[in-house]
């Protein structure tokens, strides 16, 4: 009889523990929901301002009619809140806004990333930004704007950029040249740091091709003088 009483007591204690656990779980769920709603409100407060700041930069980057917007999709609570934040991209006037990741080209993505990084420069702690041919498919004037934005970002963080445009390369604080060579049947890539004279030669080559003339050298010197 005593053993039966002890077992019954243990069962009651387990039920009591379960009730306490459920109580704590309900409390935690309530706190999670409250925090999620607070985060949602803050995101909605900043979304329009953020997208507007990004959109003001797009014309200079060769996308005059494009628009970036944010959409919030309610989902089950997770580490980043109770919403999924979707970036929507409208490439030109009259186009339907679609998911950025599935719509924008590689070159557009790099330029959009540059616009986002510039718009959020004060609040973004990322120490290193990498842009792979953000100038793909654009001309000199847009390339100049891209280079100037990257140079501005480079004042507060490290910015690495792969580029084929002299207007972008001339804006860099430091320039490197990547060379490929073959040795013993294998291909190697070498990275060469360029000094001032090397930069003049390389930018002149980017301007004029294989044959570098006095005119292209003078143009390269002028571009380096005019950087930020």
Question: What residue spans do the PLM features occupy?
Answer:
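Long, charged, glycine-rich C-terminal linkers/tails
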Residues: 59-85
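Conserved D-loop-proximal element of ABC-family nucleotide-binding domains
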Residues: 44, 48, 123-124, 136-144
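C-terminal lobe/lid and adjacent interdomain/linker elements of RecA-like ASCE P-loop ATPase modules
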Residues: 141-228
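Flexible glycine-/small-residue-rich
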Residues: 70-74, 89-93, 116-118, 180, ...
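Short pre-catalytic strand/loop immediately N-terminal to key active-site residues, enriched for Gly-Thr
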Residues: 97-103
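Extended, charged alpha-helical coiled-coil/arm scaffolds that mediate oligomerization and mechanical coupling
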Residues: 1-61, 65
